[in-house]
Regions:
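S-adenosyl-L-methionine
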Residues: 3-38
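A conserved structural/catalytic subdomain of Rossmann-like adenosyl-cofactor enzymes
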Residues: 37, 41-431
Length: 434
């Protein structure tokens, strides 16, 4: 790390978290305190993007940076007689590639632009591909970092790979929103992406184990939710009867269905074995198909209940009973969402890899041959290989309405703020003008 203050912070971070590390102050481009060439089994890195003031003369003879070629197109002069590299992206890529042992592996975060960079950088990329260093490329969603808004890609190196194909994964549509401006991967999304690579390596057991863990989590929540559903159903039925609703929704079929599903899971769980992958996968697909109608019926039931409660609320808006019931229904919706969460991940996996085997999936992943990569001028942009598919957002009608109302509230607030600013600006201009 080149900045002393950051070195101190990093050392403090290591100390307070009980980690080990050897952090030194130096400028990586010009110094090599770790003697890194061919030294490391693993490298994980998130270097700065697009550094444009690296002195070309100081790095072009360094084997850490020139083994696969030096970026030198469109070099510019910062000081008289000092030629600089166009940017440092491919210096970092070179550094991490040359730091690996013969069977070493690396993962690094890099600006999206590096995947398609042209001229000398394209030649470096071609050299890396032809030397079979690159295992895979993964496009990240935007707004994944708090301080960097640029879209980024993960590069994976594996010097021990024997297959010359490259795995491309486009994960830009896989994310969990934190707020309007920031996103993250949930733990389940990380596992779903990782299992693509494991399937590519023919590790099918990890796939059925992951699906099995989702079933365990989902059904444990369904068991708890089933009890809540019984309690709320009694209150809803009594409430609607009190207000003389003619067609009171019947909760019994859904409650019975939940009980049947739990019994089916217990039977599946008792016989589950990851050793027999094809049999386990077949049983998992069958179990998931039984779950889908349950949630469809449940959502339809709750939609009907919400509609009836809204009609009653129009004429009795101040009723404490209605407010209390609405609170319980909101809690019920939250529990449904939490319960359905793990089953949604099961559906996501089974829709794309129904046989528990790797397969190219349009819009998600592609195992590209060297000839296919040559056709794309050695681009490493996953979007060029995986294709595009238009997917539905997966929201229920209630979730869509809730999101629209939330966005409308935000727009109303922004419009009010804009009017205040407009008045303030007008007032200030008049004050200045006298």
């Amino acid at each position: 790390e080149k900045t002393l203050e950051t070195v101190k912070l990093a050392k403090m971070n290591i100390a307070v978290n009980g980690l080990r590390g050897d952090i030194k102050q130096s400028i990586t481009y010009y110094e090599d305190p770790h003697e890194s060439f061919g030294k490391f089994d693993y490298v994980l890195a998130n270097p700065p993007f697009n550094v444009d003031d690296v002195n070309l003369g100081k790095v072009e003879q360094d084997k850490r940076f020139n083994t696969y070629g030096i970026p030198r197109n469109k070099s510019k002069t910062k000081k008289k007689g000092e030629e600089t590299c166009p940017n440092g992206n491919y210096l970092w890529i070179n550094l991490f590639a040359t730091s690996l042992k013969e069977d070493g592996r690396a993962a690094l975060v890099m600006a999206n632009s590096a995947s398609d960079a042209r001229h000398s950088e394209a030649n470096i990329r071609k050299s890396l591909i032809e030397n079979n260093l690159i295992y895979g490329m993964l496009t990240l969603p935007s707004n994944m970092f708090y301080t960097v808004t640029l879209p980024a890609t993960l590069w994976f190196f594996d010097k021990a790979k024997t297959d010359d194909r490259i795995l491309f994964i486009d994960a830009k549509n896989i994310f969990t929103p934190i707020d309007r401006a920031h996103r993250e991967f949930s733990e389940e999304q990380v596992q779903n992406i990782a299992v693509i690579s494991r399937l590519h390596k023919d590790n099918r057991e990890s796939y059925v184990e992951l699906v099995h863990s989702y079933f365990q989590n989902g059904f444990s929540r369904l068991k708890v939710y089933g009890s809540s559903l019984k309690d709320v159903s009694k209150k809803v039925t009594g409430f609607l009867a009190e207000y003389k609703v003619k067609n009171i929704p019947n909760f019994s079929p859904v409650i019975d269905s939940a009980k049947t599903l739990l019994e089916g899971f217990q039977k599946y769980d008792k016989n589950y074995s990851a050793d027999n992958i094809d049999k386990s996968n077949k049983e998992q697909v069958k179990l998931a198909l039984n779950v889908k109608p349950f949630f469809e019926a449940l959502h339809q039931l709750l939609k009907t209940v919400d509609k009836e409660v809204r009609h009653i609320e129009k004429d009795n808006s101040g009723s404490k009973d209605i407010k209390a019931l609405k609170t319980e229904l909101e809690e019920l919706h939250r529990e449904v969402k939490e319960t359905e969460y793990f089953f949604a991940h099961i559906n996501w996996l089974q829709d794309r890899f129904p046989d528990a085997r790797y397969d190219d999936v349009t819009g998600l992943c592609k195992l590209a041959t060297i000839d296919e990569i040559k056709e794309q001028d050695y681009s490493l942009n996953p979007g060029r290989y995986v294709g595009v598919v238009i997917e539905e957002d997966g929201k229920t009608e209630e979730e869509f309405i809730e999101e629209m109302l939330s966005m409308n509230d935000e727009l109303t607030k922004l419009n009010a703020d804009a009017q205040k600013l407009e008045s303030t600006i007008t007032h200030n201009i008049k004050q200045i003008a006298g």
